[in-house]
Amino acid sequence: MTLRYLVISDIHGNLEALETVLTVLGGRHDKVLVLGDLVGYGADPNAVVDRVRQLDPHLVIRGNHDKVAAGLDDGESFNAVARSAVLWTYEALTPANRDYLTKLPSGPQAVDDLIEICHGTPFDEDAYLFDDLDALRAFEASSRPVCLFGHTHVAVGFRYADSALEIVAGPGDTAGLVLEFSPDAKYLINAGSVGQPRDGDPRAGAAIVDATARKIELFRIPYPIEEAQRKIRLAGLPEVLAKRLSLGR
């Protein structure tokens, strides 16, 4: 029996991106994994949380924006734009959706014997995993052969085998890339951001992991960016949050 997980992360209140990903990849997965930051930046926090809840994911973990939007953190470490947006999100959320975010577990969380998920890294849910040193520390902390992470909004993949670290995906164009998991290696993989990519590709990022065949396929999916931008402007959120969606930065 095949078991396939849809992997989505960093939706950030972008309903257009989320719905497009679900439409394009619908029917190609059995379960859903959500790696945090459902909200923040985008103008549809309630619709996104509602949609994620409707999916009944196998596992959802919190991101740093979810924590602030839920009132679990003050967001003092955020830059001015991010903090403005997340405080707007806090006010916009319904009590039920804020309560849902409050109860999301932190990462890392084991999915099965093959996979674990985290938002930032296996050693710190809020830390960023950008380079080789970050990856080595994450490999040391990871408890499964494959660790799926988010937070950076950059699609990338690292492999560690025979005491050697290599980048096996990105950063850059990862659309359509398929990686097979070797039984003698460990992997750290970021599928990119659904709602606010920052790797130069404005298309929504997602992945499907086939746990039975031990492989992952990365996707970049065009979505109606202009509508997401229109909603951000209509909500009175910072203009930069609308502009950056077109740039993928």
Predicted regions and their residues:
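Short, glycine/charged-enriched secondary-structure capping and boundary segments
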Residues: 20-23, 47-50, 74-77, 131-132, ...
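Active-site environment of divalent metal-dependent phosphoester hydrolases
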Residues: 12-17, 40-43, 65-70, 109-110, ...
